[in-house]
Amino acid sequence: MAMENPFEGKEIWFGVGSQDLYGEEALRQVAQQTGEMVDFLNATGKIPAKIVLKPTLKSSDGVKAFMTEASANPNVIGVITWCHTFSPAKMWIRGLEVLTKPLLQLATQHHKEIPWETIDMDFMNLNQAAHGDREFGYIVSRLGIPRKIVVGHYTDPEVAEKVGTWARACAGWDASQNMKVMRWGDNMRNVAVTEGDKTEAERVFGASINTWAVNDLVAAYEKVKDSQVKDLIEDYKAKYDVAPELLDSRYDELFIAAKEEAAMVNMMRENGCTAGVDNFEDLGTLPQLPGVGPQRFPSEYGWGFSAEGDWKTSVLVRIGAVMGYGLEGGASLMEDYSYNFVPGNEFDMGSHMLEVSPSIGTIAKPKLAIYPLGIGGKSDPVRLVFSGKPADAVVVSMADERERFRLLMDEVTIVEPQGSLKNLPCARAVWKPKPDLKTAVQCWITAGGSHHTCMTTSVGREAWEDFARIAGVELAVIDENTNARQFEKELELSEMYHRLNNRH
């Protein structure tokens, strides 16, 4: 089993701006040199989607046709623009106003160094990106169109890295726009932060969030073929340290867990869904609260999953899985559980009953085991038990703030647990939040962040910032420079801005 490549067949179109004023020879050089730049960027291996150079943009009609075609093509996930020469910005207005794909403005040039001894006006006319980029930048800012700006010579490794990160955010946005979320049951009773406006979420993020009866899952469970279950069990044996009793005296419970995974996967595929969520309060006649299956949603299928009806976190996990495709690490549901308040040795420990995914990386081979679980009122569930591997990571939550959604992110460092945790029968991760535990927790609570988060170890802050900019959604960030008093003031300004400037 492997996640489908979200970049397969996807393209980023590159539009270079100029004008007929410069003549055929100059325009020929514009196209040739831009082609060299695009070829170089594609060859770096840092940009997961193919960049495709389109004919030079020289007129308002040409720009509008380019933007219209890019917006209508489902394989195009983003547009890069660059002005090799001066390109009058009025000719960009009609095109920019019809663009619906993410935009990146590349401020670069073909030559790396000014040719001090040979530079003349012919060279200046051809190579005036510093001139053209400012003209283009003005009109984009005037129109209020969000875009990522990358500055530097195209051979600078940082340029390709930033373009690549943005391309990942574009893929996350494309996945969000085409996402179907399968809810088995409703929200956990009386819980506030996991609630949210599903209609507004579809308008803002594109994700279609709907409910299927748990009885539908039970019916799918009854239809699963034994051969599919046995194939899953063989996969478990190949990837995990399976507790001996699951292959002997408690094999029936292992079979049930695998059968539940198969049923969930079959329903997801039949309905074209890429994120799912269940609720331990609504299990119908399912034998177990699903454990190992949901844990494998991100790691084996690239799907989002969350618990207790929290579809918002499931959406984030799917987006995180797509953005991080092909990189080390992954995305998972995480929940803050317990603090270590020892001075100088302060940590946050996250976990969940069953659903934390090994996609984030594990210290040792995950153990597939069975333990009692009082919640849910079903038979003992089978689950993966492990500790998250040390890594840089971020935790991201989504909250419904009545008139808008807010994303909240904290940069963290996952560390090894300082003990065996031998009596803790669930997957977990221990981390140091930035800038420190007390400040991070205070700021998180001030911003109304959820106890459920999406933890990503594959992509970090920049990818989520790019995604939030594309979506036009508020993102509050807690990092090493955060000061609680200043954070509260910035949050007030952010609330005011996003209420007044809701471009949706």
Curated annotation (Swiss-Prot):
It is an enzyme of class 5 (isomerase). The keyword Metal-binding applies. It comes from the Bacteria. It catalyses: beta-L-arabinopyranose = L-ribulose. GO terms for biological process: L-arabinose catabolic process to xylulose 5-phosphate. Its EC number is 5.3.1.4. Its cofactor is Mn(2+). GO terms for cellular component: cytosol. Mn(2+) binds at residues 308, 335, 352, 452. Pathway: Carbohydrate degradation; L-arabinose degradation via L-ribulose; D-xylulose 5-phosphate from L-arabinose (bacterial route): step 1/3. The keyword Isomerase applies. Binds 1 Mn(2+) ion per subunit. Disulfide bonds: none annotated. GO terms for molecular function: L-arabinose isomerase activity; manganese ion binding. It holds the Pfam family Arabinose_Iso_C. InterPro entries: Ara_Isoase_C (IPR024664), AraA_central (IPR055390), AraA_N (IPR055389), AraA_N_sf (IPR038583), Fuc/Ara_isomerase_C (IPR004216), Fucose_isomerase_N/cen_sf (IPR009015), Lara_isomerase (IPR003762). Keywords: Arabinose catabolism, Carbohydrate metabolism, Isomerase, Manganese, Metal-binding. Belongs to the arabinose isomerase family. HAMAP family: Arabinose_Isome (MF_00519). Catalyzes the conversion of L-arabinose to L-ribulose. This is L-arabinose isomerase. It comes from Bifidobacterium adolescentis (strain ATCC 15703 / DSM 20083 / NCTC 11814 / E194a).
